[in-house]
Amino acid sequence: MVTIVLGAQFGDEGKGKITDLLSQSATLCCRAAGGHNAGHTIVHDNITYDFHILPSGLISPDCVNLIGSGTVVHVPSFFKELDALKAKGLKEADKRIFISDRAHVCFDLHSVVDGLEEADLAGKKVGTTGKGIGPCYSDKASRRGVRIGEVLEEGVAEDKLRSLEAGYRRRFGELQYDLEDEVKRFNEYRTKLQPYVVDQMAFLEKYRSCPSVLVEGANALMLDIDHGTYPYVTSSCTGLGGAIQGLTLNPTSIKSIVGVVKAYTTRVGSGPFPTEQINDIGEKLQSVGREFGVTTGRRRRCGWLDMVMCRYSNAINHYTTINLTKLDILDDFDEIKVAVAYKLDGRRLESFPAQLEVLDKVEVEYVTFPGWKSNTMGVTRWEDLPVNARRYVQFIEQEMGGVPIKWIGTGPARTHMIEREV
């Protein structure tokens, strides 16, 4: 049976920790979509691991890992990340990681084009990670991309890469890019990649009846190309639909869908953010929460928890349980606000609006809670949380339509987690 872990906000919710926890009992852990633009950190046995394209199930010694067909893979980053994990003690990691032959290749060329396209947008920049993800998915949609399996065929990837470069040169003029160097490296990767590349359909068939498959979502629902705050989104389907599509999942095999919700809201890059606090509150959340992007190092914008957004996310992803993260970051606040509705011209909106112009104008309606002003770092039992912290959690549960909050994160370590009976 399949468990899917999905971000409910703008990403950076802390999905890696619950994925790490669940992967301990998983036979197979999969990434379905996205690329090395994603990023999360896991602390295990006092060692900090940073993940981008690799599934975090690699930390579990008995878990096999797959990068699925809906992803885009920057091959140098794949090997660099794998080498970093091995250097930190995961010696057999390279024996437990595989890539779908249908995943697409993200070239250095795509990163160059990403920067040029952002520059063209001038004052309306999306705020991408600059990793080339958007141009890579564009090439995929335009049917001119290169699949991982094609790297293994002599001359195929090279011919397509040369064609891509010529097309971009016609569009942008001379590029700050060394085509021959990338061609040379991919000729070398042809042999190096061979042990990792699999036919996804045949590979997954072997695990069809296994009791525990874990799907690790990247980014989050509000960055989804269809359902997020378009155009300030990533270029892949980051919700439930993307997981099913990218891994050819049978929907009837899905046992649980875990929505990961940070106890406040953060966002990297540009785009609407109704509950953002551009004040001392936002600065405090940023500082105490150490809100810097794992992939880019950029400061994250911070604000109060937005239940309008979370309810919308739930309506699309159909969570069966919630993992609430970073509750301890709110320990020292006198009062804590939660957004429960948006108003436009004095009228409550029925749902999360699609139009950016509307989002920019909404008035946010908050419910204010008294803070608990005590240390919850490392708390592992529900009854040991302060009363006001428990009330905060229960209110979120109520606002999510009764979807139970099964896990509550109270610190960075794997052991800093409350697991409730729900």
From Swiss-Prot:
Keywords annotated in UniProt: Cytoplasm, GTP-binding, Ligase, Magnesium, Metal-binding, Nucleotide-binding, Purine biosynthesis
Binding site for Mg(2+): D12, G39
Compartmental location: Cytoplasm
Positions contributing to IMP binding: D12, E13, G14, K15, N37, A38, G39, H40, T129, R143, N219, T234, R298
An MF annotation (GO) of this entry: GMP binding
Enzyme Commission identifier(s): 6.3.4.4
Database matches in NCBIfam families: PRK01117.1, purA
Function (record text): Plays an important role in the de novo pathway and in the salvage pathway of purine nucleotide biosynthesis. Catalyzes the first committed step in the biosynthesis of AMP from IMP.
PANTHER family, alphabetized: ADENYLOSUCCINATE SYNTHETASE
Protein name per Swiss-Prot or TrEMBL: Adenylosuccinate synthetase
